[in-house]
Regions:
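RNase H-like, metal-dependent nuclease domains and their acidic two-metal-ion catalytic environment used
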Residues: 203-205
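Gly/Ser/Thr-rich beta-alpha loop segments that engage phosphate groups in nucleotides
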Residues: 10, 174-175
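Active-site-proximal alpha-helical scaffolds that flank and shape metal-associated catalytic sites
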Residues: 169-173
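A structural feature that tracks compact, well-ordered secondary-structure segments
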Residues: 177-179
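A cytosolic small-molecule/anion-sensing beta-strand core signal
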Residues: 182
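A mobile "lid/hinge" subdomain adjacent to the ATP/sugar-phosphate binding pocket shared
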Residues: 208-227
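Nucleotide/phosphate-binding catalytic cleft detector across ATP-hydrolyzing
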Residues: 1-168, 185-200, 221-222, 227
Length: 227
């Protein structure tokens, strides 16, 4: 099975085909660096282990690992977040082929060519084994990597005339990716990325204000809900 994954810094977005229908899922990133437990027998905690490091999904933990930075793309918690999202699909754990993303600033080098080192680093990271407490884990069989923002315009670009183009602006959780793409994906005229502009700036501001004025520490997930 092939699963398309936009593994952004704030949410993991999945899309896959099931019985001919397109299914989608959004899974927020909120993982603390320890396991959790549940008092309910039928509510198993979402506990994961990778290379001896333990993580658990906890949307309310103010101590959740920070994911709104570029290094998240190659981190333990990135792999855990992908596995957690796969576990939420309702699909039986199985080997899967995935397509993931990198910010344009990571996908391209200074000469606007594919940064093969970063792409290979991303592939190796995503393919690492994750153990899931109490159930089987999905096994990543193969990984392909695409740049953020550009795939969003595939369907529109296919219908453009030869002398037309599309400007794609992707304001994500951590980065702002902009691409000027020629009709039918015949070429990319210009790309630009600011790795320091994202909606997490607003989330961080809300968390700071809650801590200062309400004497309350909240998670990024809670701050997003407040917004």
């Amino acid at each position: 099975m092939k699963i398309f994954i936009d593994d952004g810094s704030t949410n993991i977005k999945l899309a896959w085909l099931e019985d001919g229908d397109v299914k989608t899922l959004i899974s927020p990133n909120s993982f603390k660096p320890e396991w959790s437990f549940s008092l309910l027998d039928d509510a198993a905690p979402a506990n994961y282990e990778i290379d001896g490091e333990k993580f658990s999904f906890d949307p309310l933990s103010a101590d959740a690992v920070v994911t709104t930075e570029t290094r998240y793309q190659y981190s333990d918690v990135n792999v855990v977040a992908i596995q957690h999202a796969l576990q939420q699909t309702g699909l039986k754990a199985q080997p899967v082929d995935v397509i993931v993303t990198l910010p344009i600033s990571e996908y391209l080098d200074a000469n606007n060519q594919k940064n093969k080192q970063n792409i290979e680093r991303k592939k190796k990271n995503v393919m690492r084994e994750v153990r899931v407490q109490g159930c089987d884990a999905f096994v990543i069989r193969s990984v392909a990597v695409l740049p953020e923002s550009i795939p969003a315009g595939f369907s529109v670009l296919a219908g453009l005339e030869d002398d037309e183009s599309l400007l794609i602006v992707d304001l994500g959780g951590t980065t702002l990716d902009v691409s000027h793409v020629r009709s039918k994906m015949t070429g990319i005229t210009k790309t630009w990325c600011d790795p320091n502009i994202g909606v997490s700036l607003i989330t961080s501001g809300v968390k700071e204000q809650m801590a200062v004025h309400a004497n309350t520490r909240v998670s990024s997930f809670q701050a997003d809900n407040i917004i």
